[in-house]
Structures are given as structure tokens and as C-alpha cells.
């Protein structure tokens, strides 16, 4: 079956379409016009209602109509309704009976009788007065509460209190007598005016004064402790938890511009912290009650939020573990930060107050009459007062040190006795300790010391005067060490030239010292003191002037070329002393014969010889480890004595090789002589003339066997 045909639609012409569109546009225009007119009517009605309500609020509150023009009031109106119109006013002359915030702000045109204006002014004044009374009452109650809870600052003893004791004891008769002991100082400048618009308080706000966050006392910068935000919050939190502060008082204190605290509240803050958390040390924080920790955390976050909002910072919620660590840091840093000398309270200077006090009265006024009361001081305070007035301070007076503190403990007894015997009342003869007063520090046995005798070469002028010499301790010390058996070269270089103890080429310490062959004595030549051997006729060995040992090239040569006492062979005393004097004469350039010069260096080579030929029928003992000296050691000691020390590579080669003379590839005597020939040709000549062992020439690589080449593939380096 076929579906029925759809009905035919009416055909609309183009003219009809245009007419329909025109009607629709006209209808839309009318709707928009009606809507805009209704909105305008609604806004006008809203503005009228706002004005009526605002005037009603002003009249009921007793405030002038000028409050409608305040910016804060207009912002409040826009907050509730953004499309609300601002109250329009007209400029007029300011009324003297109406209080205005600014004279340039336009005033609202209102119709108000004089009675209403006076009433509004009276209500405004009463409101301000009541607010001031409430604030002053609150400040008074807070200060009274502080006086009962917080300990007062430690009172500084004033000038009147300090000087009254001196007056009562009869130290000074009049004020002019005290005035002469103090310098005049200008009077301190007057404090600046208070800041405009500041709230009334018990202290005066100045640009250089800062109130304490606990006692509200005006403080100078040098009288207070600067605190960070976190430190101030912790202090105020402890005050709230311990019951000394209310939360409102702590919030008011945290809003201060500069957070400072008195020096005297440091111990009190620690007591508050201990009372708040029931802990006295950092280790006890982990054991404190949980409720204390949670309560302190809440108060800390609340005060921190108030301080951040007041300073325009982004508020932060401190977690519990950070708060706990901050409390631990306070206990950890309490002693070093609050008790050390860097934060100690500076002592005030009483000069300004004293000068002003004494200038206001005549000079003949009695001190008791000036002060009008008497006070008592202890003996220590009395002495301190007398020192202050007289300008004497004996804290830094230098005291003479004892001789036992300066010298070594080993030789203090002998040197002290020598110093006492050579004082002003003692005879002029030099003192040499006897056998009962000296002990050998190494071998611990007594020796027999020779008493000094006058020398024939002008030793009659021997004198020891303490007035001419400041401290003769150095001379006595040096003489005592030498008499103990130490070498003069070692002592002079050790004490005066800062040269370490003399060692041989291998760095070995010499054996136990033995006493010298002849004792030493002091002599004075041309106003200078000298140390020399008693039986010697040559120049002195050590030159001493005042407290300084004169060290010259000739003196150095004399000290270094003199043979060591412990290295001397077992010969007679006369031969050893003569060899020593020969070395002294040679070093000081004394005129000698050529034969004596030729015998100088071979004498040095005979220190502890292994083979000694003598005509006396003495049995030769076999060499031991203690008395055997290798040729390398002998040559190294001789070169070290003459030129200071060997080079590093030469010393290493000597240490590594058992026999220096049998190793020509490392360092032979001829090569050493060639190196030092320019420095001391005379010594090189003597060393060259000395007998030496025959050289051992090793085979070349061509003569070596294959096994020897494998064992020693590389030749040894030369130096």
C-alpha cells in the first residue's frame, strides 16, 4: 500500500518575511528599553534607600555625617553591593564644631541643627575618653602584674652610693677633692620628642629607645638583646605557659617594631622555659609530657601567625617536629649565647653624673652634706673605689718571673744558685757549681768539676755585676749545660740560632755526653763577656754581649770545627785540649805555622778510629757494634761538620750502601772533593791526602755473565 501524501505547506512571499522581521526587531527594542528603564528606577530607589539608612545609622550612633565620606565606609558599601553608588557630596566650608579627619575631603550636604552637631561632638569625645581610660587601666594592671611576677633589673650602683662610703671613712673632705680626679664631660643631649600619634604608656617612645617585650621598659641598644621573630615568640610562649602573661598581652608584645629584651631577664626566661616544659636540659625534652608539648605548639603557632600578619608576611604553620627542635636549640644555645663575655652588660661611666653633681654645689661643701646619707661598703669595694678615684689599675702590673719558671727543670737548681750568688750583694767572682749540686741528666752520676782560675791573658778584670747585665740567666744556663757535658756548639746553636740538636749524617742522636777536658770561665774584654777554656790562650770560644750570643762566620767555624766530646778517642786530657785549641785558633784566624794547619783536618778524621797503632803494650780489643765506625760514616761526619749537612741524594746513597768508599758509582771521595773544592780548597787538599781503601772496579756489561745481567739489568745512577 502506498503512504498518504503530506499536506502542502503555505507559501510565504518575500514581502511577508520582511514584515515579520521588522515586527520582531521593534518588539526587541521595546523590551530592552523597558528593561533599562526598570533598572534605572531600581538603582535610584536603592540609592535613596542607602542614603536614608546611612543617615539613620549616623544619627543613632552619634557620629557626624562626615563619616559617610570616609574611604573605609565606601569600601564597606561596595563590598556588600558592587553596583551601589557612592554618596555624592558637595564642597563647603568646614564647620568648626564638627570634627573632620581631613579638611580637603568633600563633606556631605546634610541638614543638621546646631543642637544635633554639638551632641554628636560630645558623644565622640566621650567615646575617645572611655577608650583612653580602658587602655591606661589595662596598662596599669599589666605593669602591676609584671612587678609581682618578673624580677626587677639588677640595680646598678649609682655614683652617690659608691662615693658615700669614701666620704664616711674620711677619704675625701670636700666635693672639690673628688672633682679633681674626674675629667669633665659634656652633658648628655636631651631626648627627642615622642612620635606623633603614639598611644599613652608608662615609657616615652624615642627614635633610639626600644621597649622590652617583657617589662615594657625603654631600652637603649647597648642595654638590650636583639631578638629574632622566632626567639621572641618562644619567650612569649614560655611566659604564657608559665602563667606570667595572658594571650592578649603576648599578642600585643609581638607586634612591636623592634623585638628587644633586657639583659637582666635572661635567667628569668630560662626559669620560665623550665617551668613551661618541665625540663632543664636538651636531653629532657624527649621525656616531657605530651600535653605540654601540644599546648606549647598551639600557642607558638598562634603568636607566630599574629606576628606574620602584623609585618605583612605569609603565614606558615610550623609542624610539631620543627617546634620541638626549636625548643631543643634554645636549651642548647642558652649558656654560650647568654652568659659569654660578648653579651655582657657594659658598665656605665659615672663621670657625667658626678660632674653635674659637683658643679651644682660650692667646692667647700662637705661630701656627707652633699650626699645627705651614709652607706657602708665592703673592704673590696673600698679598695676598688680608691683605685677608681686615684686612677690606678694594678691588674696588668708585670711581675718578675722566677728563675725556675724560665730555665729547664734539669738545670734549674744549679742555675738558680748561680743567679742568687751573683746578685748585687754577692762577690764578683763567677760561680761554678760543685760536685754535690750537679747531676748528670743522662748517666745520673756525679762528676768532679774543676774550680776556675784566673787566666794570664787579662782575666783579672773578671766581674759579674747585676746592674750592668739585665738578666745573666742565659750565661749561667749556657755554662751549666757545658759543664754538664754538652757541646758548646750544640747549646749556642740550639738556644740562640734556633738550630736543632746536632746530629750526624744519618740523623742519629749522639751518645751520652762526657765532661770536657777543661772547665770554662767568664772573662770581660772591652766591655764584652766571653766564655773560654781555662787553660786556653787563644781567642774566646763564645762571644756574649747582653742577652745575645754574637754569631759570626768565624764563630760558626769555631763551633762546628771543634771536635765533639763524645767522639774523642781515649787519650790524655792535654792532647784533647790542645787539639781543641788548635781548632779554635784556626777558626778565628790566629797566626799559626803551616805544620799546624796540615795537622788540623787529619785530627778530625781520627774520631773513634777503628785501627790505632801505638807503641804501648795494650791489647787490642775486637771491634764491636758500639765502637766500630765505617769509612762512610767517618767521611760523612767530617763533611757534615765542615759544611753543615750533606745533600739529600748523597745522604740517601749513604744510607742504602754499606760502604761508601767501595761504591764509586754512587758517590766517591774524589767526586765529593771535586764538588766542595771551590768552597774549602784547604779541606779538600787534606781529604785528598788522606789514605783510602783501594777502589773496586766492577766488570762491564760485556764482561758480565748472563746470570749477572739478569740479576742487575740496569746500571746504578750516578747521583
UniProtKB/Swiss-Prot annotation:
<dbReference type="GO" id="GO:0030154">
    <property type="term" value="P:cell differentiation"/>
</dbReference>
<dbReference type="GO" id="GO:0042659">
    <property type="term" value="P:regulation of cell fate specification"/>
</dbReference>
<protein>
    <recommendedName>
        <fullName>Protein lin-15A</fullName>
    </recommendedName>
</protein>
<feature type="region of interest" description="Disordered">
    <location>
        <begin position="684"/>
        <end position="719"/>
    </location>
</feature>
<feature type="compositionally biased region" description="Polar residues">
    <location>
        <begin position="604"/>
        <end position="617"/>
    </location>
</feature>
<feature type="compositionally biased region" description="Low complexity">
    <location>
        <begin position="570"/>
        <end position="579"/>
    </location>
</feature>
<feature type="region of interest" description="Disordered">
    <location>
        <begin position="419"/>
        <end position="464"/>
    </location>
</feature>
<dbReference type="GO" id="GO:0040027">
    <property type="term" value="P:negative regulation of vulval development"/>
</dbReference>
<keyword id="KW-0217">Developmental protein</keyword>
<dbReference type="GO" id="GO:0007548">
    <property type="term" value="P:sex differentiation"/>
</dbReference>
<dbReference type="GO" id="GO:0040025">
    <property type="term" value="P:vulval development"/>
</dbReference>
<dbReference type="GO" id="GO:0050821">
    <property type="term" value="P:protein stabilization"/>
</dbReference>
<dbReference type="Pfam" id="PF25375">
    <property type="entry name" value="Lin-15B"/>
</dbReference>
<comment type="function">
    <text>Synthetic multivulva (synMuv) class A protein. SynMuv proteins are required to repress the induction of vulval development. Acts redundantly with SynMuv class B protein lin-15B, and lin-35 to negatively regulate vulval development, most likely through antagonization of the Ras-signaling pathway. May also negatively regulate vulval development in association with other SynMuv class B proteins such as dpl-1 and efl-1. Regulates let-23 basal activity. Required for the correct expression and/or stability of lin-56.</text>
</comment>
<keyword id="KW-0539">Nucleus</keyword>
<feature type="region of interest" description="Disordered">
    <location>
        <begin position="559"/>
        <end position="626"/>
    </location>
</feature>
<feature type="region of interest" description="Disordered">
    <location>
        <begin position="179"/>
        <end position="199"/>
    </location>
</feature>
<keyword id="KW-0726">Sexual differentiation</keyword>
<dbReference type="GO" id="GO:0005634">
    <property type="term" value="C:nucleus"/>
</dbReference>
<dbReference type="GO" id="GO:0010628">
    <property type="term" value="P:positive regulation of gene expression"/>
</dbReference>
<keyword id="KW-0221">Differentiation</keyword>
<feature type="compositionally biased region" description="Basic and acidic residues">
    <location>
        <begin position="693"/>
        <end position="719"/>
    </location>
</feature>
Amino acid at each position: 500500500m502506498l503512504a498518504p501524501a503530506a499536506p502542502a505547506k503555505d507559501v510565504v512571499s518575500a514581502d511577508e518575511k520582511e514584515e515579520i522581521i521588522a515586527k520582531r526587531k521593534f518588539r526587541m527594542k521595546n523590551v530592552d528599553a523597558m528593561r533599562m528603564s526598570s533598572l534605572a528606577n531600581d538603582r535610584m530607589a536603592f540609592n535613596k534607600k542607602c542614603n536614608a539608612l546611612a543617615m539613620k545609622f549616623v544619627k543613632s550612633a552619634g557620629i557626624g555625617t562626615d563619616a559617610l565620606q570616609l574611604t573605609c565606609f565606601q569600601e564597606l558599601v561596595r563590598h556588600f553591593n558592587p553596583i551601589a553608588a557612592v554618596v555624592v557630596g558637595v564642597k563647603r566650608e568646614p564647620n568648626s564644631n564638627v570634627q573632620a579627619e581631613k579638611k580637603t575631603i568633600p563633606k556631605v550636604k546634610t541638614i543638621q541643627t546646631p543642637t544635633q552637631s554639638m551632641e554628636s561632638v560630645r558623644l565622640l569625645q566621650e567615646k575617645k575618653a572611655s577608650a583612653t581610660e580602658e587602655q591606661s587601666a589595662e596598662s596599669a594592671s599589666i605593669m602591676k602584674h609584671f612587678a609581682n611576677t618578673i624580677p626587677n633589673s639588677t640595680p646598678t650602683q649609682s655614683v652617690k652610693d659608691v662615693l658615700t662610703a669614701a666620704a664616711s671613712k674620711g677619704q675625701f673632705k670636700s666635693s672639690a677633692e673628688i672633682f679633681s680626679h674626674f675629667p669633665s664631660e659634656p652633658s648628655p643631649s636631651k631626648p627627642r620628642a615622642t612620635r606623633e600619634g603614639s598611644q599613652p604608656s608608662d615609657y616615652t617612645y624615642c627614635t633610639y629607645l626600644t621597649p622590652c617585650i617583657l617589662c615594657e621598659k625603654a631600652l637603649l641598644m647597648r642595654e638590650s638583646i636583639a631578638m629574632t621573630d622566632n626567639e621572641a615568640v618562644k619567650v612569649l610562649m614560655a611566659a604564657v605557659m608559665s602563667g606570667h602573661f595572658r594571650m592578649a598581652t603576648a599578642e600585643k608584645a609581638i607586634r612591636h617594631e623592634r623585638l628587644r629584651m633586657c639583659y637582666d631577664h635572661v635567667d628569668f626566661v630560662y626559669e620560665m622555659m623550665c617551668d613551661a616544659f618541665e625540663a632543664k636540659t636538651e636531653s629532657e625534652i624527649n621525656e616531657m609530657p605530651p600535653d605540654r608539648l601540644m599546648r606549647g605548639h598551639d600557642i607558638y603557632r598562634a603568636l607566630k601567625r599574629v606576628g606574620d600578619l602584623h609585618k605583612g608576611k605569609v603565614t606558615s604553620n610550623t609542624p610539631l617536629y620543627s617546634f620541638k627542635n626549636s625548643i631543643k636549640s634554645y636549651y642548647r644555645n642558652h649558656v654560650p649565647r647568654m652568659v659569654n663575655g660578648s653579651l655582657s652588660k657594659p658598665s656605665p661611666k659615672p663621670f657625667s653624673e658626678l660632674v653635674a653633681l659637683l658643679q651644682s654645689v660650692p667646692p667647700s661643701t662637705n661630701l656627707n652634706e652633699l650626699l645627705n646619707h651614709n652607706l657602708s661598703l665592703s673592704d673590696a669595694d673600698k679598695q676598688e673605689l680608691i683605685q677608681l678615684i686615684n686612677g690606678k689599675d694594678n691588674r696588668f702590673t708585670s711581675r718578675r718571673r722566677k728563675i725556675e719558671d724560665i730555665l729547664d727543670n734539669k738545670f734549674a737548681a744549679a742555675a738558680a744558685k748561680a743567679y742568687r750568688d751573683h746578685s748585687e750583694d754577692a762577690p764578683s767572682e763567677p760561680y761554678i757549681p760543685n760536685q754535690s749540686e750537679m747531676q748528670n741528666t743522662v748517666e745520673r752520676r756525679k762528676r768532679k768539676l774543676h774550680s776556675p782560675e784566673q787566666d794570664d791573658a787579662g782575666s783579672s778584670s773578671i766581674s759579674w755585676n747585676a746592674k750592668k747585665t739585665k738578666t745573666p740567666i742565659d750565661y749561667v744556663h749556657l755554662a751549666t749545660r757545658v759543664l754538664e757535658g754538652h757541646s758548646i756548639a750544640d747549646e749556642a746553636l740550639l738556644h740562640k740560632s734556633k738550630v736543632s740538636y746536632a746530629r750526624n749524617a744519618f740523623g742519629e742522636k749522639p751518645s751520652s755526653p762526657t765532661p770536657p777536658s777543661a772547665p770554662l770561665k767568664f772573662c770581660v774584654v772591652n766591655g764584652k763577656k766571653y766564655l773560654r777554656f781555662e787553660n786556653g790562650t787563644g781567642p774566646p770560644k763564645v762571644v756574649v754581649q747582653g742577652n745575645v750570643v754574637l754569631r759570626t762566620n768565624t764563630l760558626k767555624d769555631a763551633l762546628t770545627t771543634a771536635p765533639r766530646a763524645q767522639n774523642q778517642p781515649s787519650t790524655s786530657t792535654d792532647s784533647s785540649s790542645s787539639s781543641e785549641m788548635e781548632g779554635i785558633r784556626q777558626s778565628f784566624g790566629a797566626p799559626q805555622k803551616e805544620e799546624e794547619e796540615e795537622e788540623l783536618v787529619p785530627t778530625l778524621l781520627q774520631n773513634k778510629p777503628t785501627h790505632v797503632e801505638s807503641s804501648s803494650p795494650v791489647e787490642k780489643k775486637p771491634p764491636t757494634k758500639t765502637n766500630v765506625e765505617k769509612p762512610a760514616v767517618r767521611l760523612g761526619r767530617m763533611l757534615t761538620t765542615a759544611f753543615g749537612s750533606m745533600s739529600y741524594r748523597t745522604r740517601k746513597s749513604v744510607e742504602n750502601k754499606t760502604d761508601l768508599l767501595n761504591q764509586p758509582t754512587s758517590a766517591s771521595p774524589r767526586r765529593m772533593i771535586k764538588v766542595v773544592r771551590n768552597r774549602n780548597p784547604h779541606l779538600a787538599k787534606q781529604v785528598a791526602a788522606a789514605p783510602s781503601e783501594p777502589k773496586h772496579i766492577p766488570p762491564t756489561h760485556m764482561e758480565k755473565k748472563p746470570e749477572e745481567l739478569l740479576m742487575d739489568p740496569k746500571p746504578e745512577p750516578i747521583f
